[in-house]
Design a protein with these regions (language model features):
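Basic/aromatic-rich interaction segments and small domains that mediate binding to polyanionic partners
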Residues: 10, 15-37, 79, 118-133, ...
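Short, basic/aromatic beta-hairpin or loop at an interaction surface
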Residues: 102-118
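Generic detector of short, locally flexible boundary/turn motifs and exposed helical patches
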Residues: 2-3, 41-43, 100-105, 123-128, ...
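Short, solvent-exposed coil/turn linker segments
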Residues: 47, 87, 106-107, 127, ...
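N-terminal intrinsically disordered, low-complexity, charge/repeat-rich segments that act as generic
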Residues: 1-102
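Residue-level preference for alpha-helix termini and adjacent loops
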Residues: 57, 62, 68, 85, ...
Length: 226
């Protein structure tokens, strides 16, 4: 999905100011928003990539004018309505229209539930990787309407495989259908001038984690030269 959340390489937004001794939460409501996301996630109606995709639907002007945890709250509200856990009217009025049809975790169950969260690794689910360290690859020119982890600035670019991180759930399909499709994930090194042109520093490089379906051999027959 080409949205305002994918800001890499865009101009005009000013510097990223690092806050010294930054707290985990700046306001009490942010901690509540974070806890609500975790608690609702334990209901099993969506996964982490669906959560990211929900936040990506925030209108661009609203996205730029709001904070990190406001994005989280927007995505949660959207999912609660989409999954019929609340109605749009209940969200608008902030009043329940009836008893909830879900069973919430008890405080005593929370530590166990957090410990039991499963990692996205699927190393036992796929054969040998298609690429290895040192291989030249080209990212595909993908512009899906659904979720993807391939940033716009790194599409249709040539890089070199630095390492294979292993096999993980492919976020794209996980967000769109919930299917757990295994895919190798590689750290790919892109030279700065490959991404940004002649204005980039000659010693600059960017490492992007790319899933195997995003990549193809750079030296395939008929590929444009680099």
């Amino acid at each position: 999905m080409n949205g305002i959340h994918d800001l890499g390489g865009m101009h005009g937004f000013g510097p990223v100011d690092a806050e010294e001794n930054e707290p985990v939460f700046h306001h009490e409501w942010e901690a509540r928003a974070f806890a609500l996301n975790l608690a609702a996630g334990f209901l099993g109606r969506w996964n982490i990539d669906m959560g990211r995709y929900a936040r990506e639907h925030m209108p661009p002007a609203e996205y730029l004018a709001t904070t990190y945890y406001e994005h989280w709250l927007y995505g949660l509200e959207r999912l609660l309505v989409e999954k019929s856990l609340i109605t749009a009217k209940e969200l608008e009025t902030m009043r329940s229209q009836g008893p909830a049809a879900v069973k919430a975790l008890s405080p005593a169950d929370v530590p166990r539930a957090l410990r039991n969260r499963r990692a996205a690794r699927m190393d036992d689910r796929l054969a040998a990787p298609r690429f290895k360290a040192g291989d030249r690859v080209r990212t595909k020119n993908l512009h899906p309407t659904g979720h993807t982890r391939l940033p716009r600035y790194a599409r249709d670019k040539v890089g070199v495989i630095d390492r294979d991180h292993g096999v993980f759930i492919l976020p794209d399909e996980h967000a769109n259908s919930g299917a757990k499709v295994p895919a190798h994930c590689y750290a790919v090194r892109f030279e700065g001038r490959e991404l940004w042109g002649a204005d980039a520093g000659p010693r600059d490089a960017v490492f992007v984690d790319c899933f195997e379906p995003y990549l193809e051999p750079a030296d395939r027959p008929g590929a444009p030269p680099r």
